[in-house]
């Protein structure tokens, strides 16, 4: 069995990859997109966090995934589960999170960690709140498009007539709930066919590890970013409608 971790950005992509690797799977480090992948395992943490574009390799997703070996995992925001029948030897771990959390987290990643996104840098926009509004205007819709694709995956899983989408090869989770206690880790380990007794230690080891975009040294007042302008832009994204639809589909969000 191979594993593809499909996430909304900032919903535990690298955290889940690290955790699952500690359960006995091999992390390729492939961050998969449609026509390329980031070869994160071939570069150090500094390069991955600040200059991820340097790790980019051109290759169609199908080629990247089908070349993987049994027991390996890859990850990304590209909706491979929408084509799950093309990958019968894959198990899909799908992780979502509330957009108020993912939007802020991705903004912080773009502004404070990455050094290859000039339009959102502190040199370009001095005030953090203005920069957050600029991020929401320029990138918010793209972010919510990925959210909508996760909704699409869930809708197909919930539809009994869509027999190509097999429940037994998909595990859906809320990343914030996953972090709250061992129950989520135990459930994921069991879903992957791993002894659940291994999960608590693996989870604590991953918590202590430095993964690619974990905010361990950034002090940002996230609440203060939500000024009136940011709230107005957020409302225009219809993000809460996405959240409500997720709840209707059974999401714990």
PLM region descriptions:
Residues 16, 20, 184-188, 233, ...:
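Generic structural signal for hydrophobic residues
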Residues 24-26, 184-198:
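Non-catalytic, well-ordered alpha-helical segments in soluble enzyme domains
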Residues 110-141:
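A solvent-exposed, charged loop/short amphipathic helix patch at secondary-structure junctions
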């Amino acid at each position: 069995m191979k594993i593809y971790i499909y996430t909304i950005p900032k919903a535990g992509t690298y955290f889940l990859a690290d955790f699952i690797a500690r359960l006995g799977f091999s992390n390729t480090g492939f961050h998969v997109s449609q026509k390329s992948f980031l070869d994160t395992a071939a570069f150090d943490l500094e390069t991955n966090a600040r200059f991820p574009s340097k790790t980019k390799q051109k290759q169609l997703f199908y080629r990247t995934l089908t070349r993987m070996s049994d027991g390996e995992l890859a990850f990304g925001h590209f909706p491979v589960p929408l084509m799950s029948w093309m990958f019968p030897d894959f198990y899909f771990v799908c992780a979502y999170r509330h957009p108020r959390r993912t939007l802020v987290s991705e903004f912080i990643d773009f502004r404070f960690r990455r050094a290859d996104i000039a339009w959102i840098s502190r040199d370009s926009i001095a005030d953090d709140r203005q920069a957050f509004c600029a991020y929401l205007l320029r990138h918010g819709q793209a972010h919510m498009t990925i959210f909508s694709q996760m909704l699409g995956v869930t809708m197909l899983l919930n539809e009994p007539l869509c027999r190509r989408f097999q429940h037994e090869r998909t595990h859906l989770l809320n990343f914030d709930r996953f972090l709250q206690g061992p129950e989520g880790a135990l459930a994921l380990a069991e879903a992957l066919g791993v002894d659940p007794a291994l999960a608590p230690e693996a989870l604590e080891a991953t918590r202590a590890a430095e993964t690619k975009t974990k905010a361990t040294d950034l002090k940002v007042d996230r609440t203060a970013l939500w000024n009136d302008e940011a709230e107005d832009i957020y409302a225009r994204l219809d993000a809460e409608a996405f959240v409500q639809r997720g709840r209707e589909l059974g999401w714990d969000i």
